[in-house]
């Protein structure tokens, strides 16, 4: 009996790739054949995918980077990617195509639309990304990570939550150790690509904490390559025990051991925080399309599980005050951790799997 075949299309950031990885893990366990279609940027994140996942790098591009010449080449490169993917799909037909957003998902979704293959998209944020907005009315359904999600007229939305990787599910609801007079961990995440503003502000905020509190703090700080040296030097100069890396491959473990998470409000980060259950201070990316990171944070802040600081209000003094507020009130910190758990959707992957299986049995749209 021929195995069913799922093609997953996802862009080159952790926000798109981590939920795609979660679906790949689940469908492989169910005996499906799984292929990931992405570009060179996305290929950097494939190390976490199960080794049985087939990987295809496609021709794609984005209007967000490069000069006039680079932008002029975007449409031809995407068109070439669609043509090549359509040719491949005619020879090797997927039962379902699922897009997770980002420009590299255009070739697979575009080809599936041309060939009228069963297809759907997953939107991680409370506001549709540009690519998902393009396809929202051209797919069987939009699986939504945040609810409500602003959808165009005619799009069929279904709330599933944001799938998290198996390594996160293994630590779902991990026991929380409230802050106290013993070593305490702070995890600083700027999304999969780091965030300069966190590298500018967080070290100074931790240095500004009273010595009787600061002496117990251990920091794991994700910083961009170009910021790593100065951030490391700052922590060392102020006697702060810190590990600084451009990317942590063991975020679930570090998060489960943390007393506090300081993070952007990307969909995957918020999902991990909710499923593991940790107090957090969230700084939404101000330039995010449709201010979607503020929308992502709404469930956590509404449950009093997170403190939200807009970028315009962020400085070391303000952040230090909020860090101290969490780490000097253990009972309140424990309440925040429990409240975070109440917003999580650890069954999001199962819900998404159900939609994929239903779509595989339906008539081609």
From Swiss-Prot:
- Enzyme group, top EC level? transferase
Please report the record's description of how this protein sits within the membrane: Peripheral membrane protein
| Biological-process GO terms, alphabetical | carbohydrate metabolic process; cell division; cell wall organization; lipid glycosylation; peptidoglycan biosynthetic process; regulation of cell shape
- Pathway annotation from the record: Cell wall biogenesis; peptidoglycan biosynthesis
Keywords (alphabetical) are: Cell cycle, Cell division, Cell inner membrane, Cell membrane, Cell shape, Cell wall biogenesis/degradation, Glycosyltransferase, Membrane, Peptidoglycan synthesis, Transferase
Q: Name one Pfam family in it.
A: Glyco_transf_28
- Recorded superkingdom: Bacteria
User: Where primarily located?
Assistant: membrane
Q: What InterPro entries does its record include?
A: GlcNAc_MurG (IPR006009), Glyco_trans_28_C (IPR007235), GlycoTrans_28_N (IPR004276)
Question: Catalytic activity annotated for this protein?
Answer: di-trans,octa-cis-undecaprenyl diphospho-N-acetyl-alpha-D-muramoyl-L-alanyl-D-glutamyl-meso-2,6-diaminopimeloyl-D-alanyl-D-alanine + UDP-N-acetyl-alpha-D-glucosamine = di-trans,octa-cis-undecaprenyl diphospho-[N-acetyl-alpha-D-glucosaminyl-(1->4)]-N-acetyl-alpha-D-muramoyl-L-alanyl-D-glutamyl-meso-2,6-diaminopimeloyl-D-alanyl-D-alanine + UDP + H(+)
Annotated GO CC locations: plasma membrane
Question: According to its UniProt record, where is this protein located?
Answer: Cell inner membrane
Question: Any idea of its EC number?
Answer: 2.4.1.227
> GO molecular function terms here?
UDP-N-acetyl-D-glucosamine:N-acetylmuramoyl-L-alanyl-D-glutamyl-meso-2,6-diaminopimelyl-D-alanyl-D-alanine-diphosphoundecaprenol 4-beta-N-acetylglucosaminlytransferase activity; undecaprenyldiphospho-muramoylpentapeptide beta-N-acetylglucosaminyltransferase activity
- What are the binding positions for UDP-N-acetyl-alpha-D-glucosamine in this chain? 13-15, 125, 165, 192, 293
State the function annotated in the UniProt record. Cell wall formation. Catalyzes the transfer of a GlcNAc subunit on undecaprenyl-pyrophosphoryl-MurNAc-pentapeptide (lipid intermediate I) to form undecaprenyl-pyrophosphoryl-MurNAc-(pentapeptide)GlcNAc (lipid intermediate II).
Q: Which family does the entry's similarity section mention? A: Belongs to the glycosyltransferase 28 family. MurG subfamily.
- Output this protein's name: UDP-N-acetylglucosamine--N-acetylmuramyl-(pentapeptide) pyrophosphoryl-undecaprenol N-acetylglucosamine transferase
Organism listed in the record: Ruegeria pomeroyi (strain ATCC 700808 / DSM 15171 / DSS-3)
Gene behind the chain: murG
């Amino acid at each position: 009996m021929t195995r069913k075949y799922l093609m997953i299309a996802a862009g080159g950031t952790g926000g798109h790739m981590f939920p795609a990885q979660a679906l790949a893990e689940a469908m492989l366990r169910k005996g499906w054949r799984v292929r990931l279609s992405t570009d060179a940027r996305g290929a950097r994140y494939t190390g976490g995918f199960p080794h049985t996942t087939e990987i295809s790098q496609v021709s794609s591009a984005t209007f967000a980077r490069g000069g006039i010449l680079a932008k002029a080449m975007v449409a031809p490169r995407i068109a070439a990617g669609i043509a090549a993917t359509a040719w491949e799909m005619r020879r090797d037909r997927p039962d379902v195509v699922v897009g997770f957003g980002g420009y590299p998902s255009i070739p697979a979704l575009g080809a599936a639309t041309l060939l009228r293959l069963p297809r759907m998209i997953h939107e991680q944020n409370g506001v549709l990304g540009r690519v998902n907005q393009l396809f929202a009315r051209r797919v069987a359904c939009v699986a939504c990570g945040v609810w409500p999600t602003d959808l165009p007229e005619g799009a069929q939305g279904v709330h599933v939550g944001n799938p998290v990787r198996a390594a996160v599910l293994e630590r779902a609801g991990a026991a929380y150790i409230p802050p106290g007079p013993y070593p305490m961990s702070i995890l600083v995440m700027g999304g999969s690509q780091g965030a300069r503003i966190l590298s500018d502000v967080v070290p100074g905020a931790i240095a500004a904490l009273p010595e009787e509190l600061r002496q117990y703090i251990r920091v794991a700080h994700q910083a961009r390559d170009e910021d790593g040296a100065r951030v490391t030097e700052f922590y060392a100069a102020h006697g702060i025990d810190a590990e600084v890396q451009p990317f942590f491959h063991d975020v679930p473990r570090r998060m489960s051991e943390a007393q506090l998470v300081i993070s952007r409000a990307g969909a995957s980060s918020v999902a991990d925080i909710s499923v593991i259950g940790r107090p957090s201070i969230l700084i939404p990316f101000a330039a995010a399309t449709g201010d979607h990171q503020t929308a992502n944070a709404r469930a956590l802040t509404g449950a009093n599980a997170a403190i939200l600081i807009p970028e315009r209000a962020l400085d070391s003094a303000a952040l230090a005050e909020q860090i101290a507020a969490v780490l000097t009130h253990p009972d309140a910190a424990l309440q925040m951790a429990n409240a975070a758990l109440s917003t999580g959707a650890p069954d999001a992957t199962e819900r998404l799997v159900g939609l994929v299986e239903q779509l595989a049995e339906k008539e081609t749209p």
